[in-house]
Amino acid sequence: MDHQTAEALRAFTQRYCAAWQQQRNSLPRSEELYGVPSPCVVDTQGEAVFWQPQPFSLAQNISAVERALDIVVQQPLHSYYTTQFAGDMTGRFADETLTLLQTWSEEDFQRVQENLIGHLVVQKRLKLAPTLFIATLESGRDVISVCNLSGEVIKETLGTAKRITLSPSLASFLSHLEPVL
């Protein structure tokens, strides 16, 4: 496990949860995750769940992605996807407001790996350098990803070679990410 990435993710999650406590006097709340089972669910009100992060309970790797494409995934990405179960969290990095994707449950972890595999298959078909997404942007065509060759965090336009480097590492990116509610 890449401890720097795991610690940076836990620290951002703590900042995010603290922002909810300070600004809304509650745990993080999600309507999108209502009705979806997770060890993170603390309470349900109306059609929303209140959640808090929980320790990841499965093998701490995304080896299914590696096996499917016969590649080696950078260690920070293994750590990112297997540090915790949590709801997706919004944040800001420089001028980008994004939704940091998280694994909500054991079942969700399988879906996340399938989506990563699909993303990598499309990139391979288009002869693009492999990336694994970690966040979405409002545009829908752009995502925040980690380049599997360099380890850099990039903003990429899906299906194209358009990429902008945002941070030299995933740990650095997470350390500079600010919560947005």
From Swiss-Prot:
Interacts with the SecY protein in vivo. May bind preferentially to an uncomplexed state of SecY, thus functioning either as a chelating agent for excess SecY in the cell or as a regulatory factor that negatively controls the translocase function. GO terms for cellular component: cytoplasmic side of plasma membrane. InterPro entries: Syd (IPR009948), Syd_sf (IPR038228). The gene is syd. Disulfide bonds: none annotated. Keywords: Cell inner membrane, Cell membrane, Membrane. It is found in: Cell inner membrane. This is Protein Syd. It comes from Klebsiella pneumoniae (strain 342). Belongs to the Syd family. It is a peripheral membrane protein. Pfam families: Syd (PF07348). Its main location: membrane.
